[in-house]
């Protein structure tokens, strides 16, 4: 029977360690979200005083499991045990009270509060009058930093810190809860090489103090440098656990990508035409650099890479969302400067963003209102009046062509499935008759049937001469749909693969360089 967080906290405080072969373990865990099985009967076992890396492609289920262990999600099935005792974690506070702390990739500090205030928020020491004792809080922070070999002024506001130092503050905050378990999600994604070395020194110190560390990463070199053992997840399933000294880089890649490509991604051979888009030495300071590539009419250029590779940033820069620091862009052989999405649309570019709910669909509006956004002013307004009949007929035809499942165009988009929402967005851009279509994670979060429909539409656009740039974290999709694949790692293009030579292992080798 699972014990309450309060009871487990008492067990932890007493020092009792029943059946503590593992510091933290999960067995038979399942977690579903609408239309998606994120975790299917997975297991995980963390030893005391060890660093345990979690590996897997994007969407493998790593972060979902860690959010369960941190009390952010509750599992639909399965057992979580802390020092051998089954527990139920219903909130992050439950996890913290039981010594489990998660350091998120995004970092969750208050920028206008001091370092000390961030660390001790809601736990501030009080003087005899009930007011916060800033002197004591400063001393507590200095003692904590001394333990971790962190050199940061406790009284400086967080907004003045570098990303690396903010991360150090997050780690110190987690340790301040007397945590037995620290969960780190891609902790080096924004750090320089020297900052990574400092982080690893702190991790080794924490390990020597008996703390168990869960380390989510995509980077092979980090696994071999800092992890004692690792587990691989794939498609929401547990694949295996090994000591990091017992395997090679190729072994891990095979575990991560060990599945065959299905016929769900048939690639139709279409004539490849002239160069439509040419990018030369494109840079965005601190994000990506010297990105160069070409894409031709009728070609699907797949873009692969792991979290932090800069793929989406390149797409946003091409579409005018963020101006580049340097570099050149040519359309049909002529140099262009695209400083806004409006200019990009005028140049017959279209961009399907990776997050349809935040930067794509206007969920509270209906299908018609969503589809017309990019074309209303230019094509359906004459003499100051909207040609409503022509607009509705055009959008109706597009919805039928895309097989959007809806009773009518006045259905609110929030009521549609993820796949149909994506079709509405594609319809919006098809109405602009683009010559260049940039797709960022076009099938993320939609079911298998809807994915096949999206792939059909992408193939149709290529057949009609559109130059397609398709960013995807799904390896079968990249391999199954692309004529060529450009691979990125940490803001750099690490290589190109033609369709006939591309394999999952070759892509992963380039992506993890």
UniProtKB/Swiss-Prot annotation:
* Pfam families for the chain: ABC_tran
Q: Which InterPro entries match?
A: AAA+_ATPase (IPR003593), ABC_carbohydrate_import_ATPase (IPR050107), ABC_transporter-like_ATP-bd (IPR003439), ABC_transporter-like_CS (IPR017871), P-loop_NTPase (IPR027417)
Membrane-crossing residue ranges in chain numbering: none
Annotated GO molecular function terms are: ABC-type D-ribose transporter activity; ATP binding; ATP hydrolysis activity
- Disulfide bond is among the record's keywords: no
Enzymatic reactions: D-ribose(out) + ATP + H2O = D-ribose(in) + ADP + phosphate + H(+); D-galactose(out) + ATP + H2O = D-galactose(in) + ADP + phosphate + H(+)
Q: What class of enzyme is it?
A: translocase
Q: Which amino acids does the record list as binding ATP?
A: 56-63
- Chief subcellular location: membrane
Q: How does it sit in the membrane?
A: Peripheral membrane protein
Question: Which cysteine pairs make disulfide bonds?
Answer: none
Keywords of the record: ATP-binding, Cell inner membrane, Cell membrane, Membrane, Nucleotide-binding, Repeat, Sugar transport, Translocase, Transport
Record-linked SUPFAM superfamilies:
P-loop containing nucleoside triphosphate hydrolases
Under Enzyme Commission nomenclature, its number is 7.5.2.11, 7.5.2.7
Ranges for domain ABC transporter come to 24-260, 270-510
Annotated compartments: Cell inner membrane
Of the GO CC terms on this record, one is:
plasma membrane
Domain of life of the source: Bacteria
Per its database record, what is this protein's job?
Part of an ABC transporter complex involved in carbohydrate import. Could be involved in ribose, galactose and/or methyl galactoside import. Responsible for energy coupling to the transport system.
Per the record, the similarity remark reads: Belongs to the ABC transporter superfamily. Carbohydrate importer 2 (CUT2) (TC 3.A.1.2) family.
Q: What is this protein called?
A: Putative ribose/galactose/methyl galactoside import ATP-binding protein 2
């Amino acid at each position: 029977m699972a014990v309450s967080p309060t009871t487990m906290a008492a067990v932890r405080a007493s020092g009792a360690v029943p059946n503590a072969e593992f510091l933290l373990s999960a067995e038979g865990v399942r977690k579903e979200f609408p239309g998606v099985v994120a975790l299917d009967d997975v297991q995980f076992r963390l030893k005391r005083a060890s660093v345990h890396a979690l590996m897997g492609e994007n969407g493998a289920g790593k972060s979902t499991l860690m959010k369960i262990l941190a009390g952010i999600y509750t599992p639909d099935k399965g057992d979580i045990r802390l020092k051998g005792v089954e527990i139920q974690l219903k909130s992050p506070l439950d996890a913290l009270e039981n010594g489990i702390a998660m350091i998120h990739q995004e970092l969750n500090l208050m920028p206008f509060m001091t370092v000390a205030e961030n660390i001790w928020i809601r736990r501030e020491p009080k003087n005899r009058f009930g007011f916060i004792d800033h002197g004591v809080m400063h001393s507590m922070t200095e003692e904590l930093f001394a333990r971790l070999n962190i050199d940061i002024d406790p009284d400086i506001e967080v907004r003045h810190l570098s990303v690396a130092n903010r991360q150090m503050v997050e780690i110190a905050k987690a340790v301040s809860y007397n945590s037995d378990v620290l969960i780190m999600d891609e902790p080096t994604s924004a750090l320089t090489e020297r900052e990574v070395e400092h982080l690893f020194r702190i991790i080794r110190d924490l390990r020597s103090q008996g703390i168990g560390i869960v380390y989510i990463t995509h980077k092979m070199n980090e696994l071999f440098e800092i992890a004692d053992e690792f587990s691989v997840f794939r498609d929401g399933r547990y694949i295996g656990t090994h000591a990091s000294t017992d395997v090679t880089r190729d072994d891990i890649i095979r575990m991560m990508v060990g599945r065959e490509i299905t016929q769900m991604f048939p690639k139709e051979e279409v004539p490849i035409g002239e160069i439509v888009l040419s990018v030369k030495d494109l840079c965005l300071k601190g994000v990506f650099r010297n990105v160069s590539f070409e894409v031709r009419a009728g070609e699907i250029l797949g873009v692969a890479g792991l979290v932090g590779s800069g793929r989406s940033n390149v797409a946003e820069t091409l579409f005018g969302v963020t101006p580049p620091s340097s570099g050149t862009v040519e359309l049909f052989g002529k140099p262009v400067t695209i400083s806004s999405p409006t200019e990009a649309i005028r140049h017959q570019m279209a961009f399907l963003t990776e997050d349809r709910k935040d930067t794509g669909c206007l969920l509270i509006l209906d299908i018609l209102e969503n589809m017309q956004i990019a074309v209303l002013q230019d094509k359906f307004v004459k003499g100051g009046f909207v040609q409503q009949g022509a607009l509705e007929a055009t959008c109706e035809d597009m919805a039928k062509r895309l097989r959007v499942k809806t009773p009518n165009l006045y259905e609110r988009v929030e009521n549609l499935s993820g796949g149909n929402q994506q079709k509405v967005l594609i319809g919006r851009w098809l109405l602009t008759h683009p010559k260049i279509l940039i797709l960022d994670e076009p099938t993320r979060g939609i079911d298998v049937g809807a994915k096949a429909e999206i792939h059909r539409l992408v193939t149709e656009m290529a057949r009609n001469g559109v130059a397609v740039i398709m960013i995807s974290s799904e390896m079968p999709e990249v391999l199954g749909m692309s004529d060529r694949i450009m691979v990125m790692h940490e803001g750099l293009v690490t290589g190109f693969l033609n369709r006939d030579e591309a394999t999952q292992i070759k892509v992963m080798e380039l992506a993890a360089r």
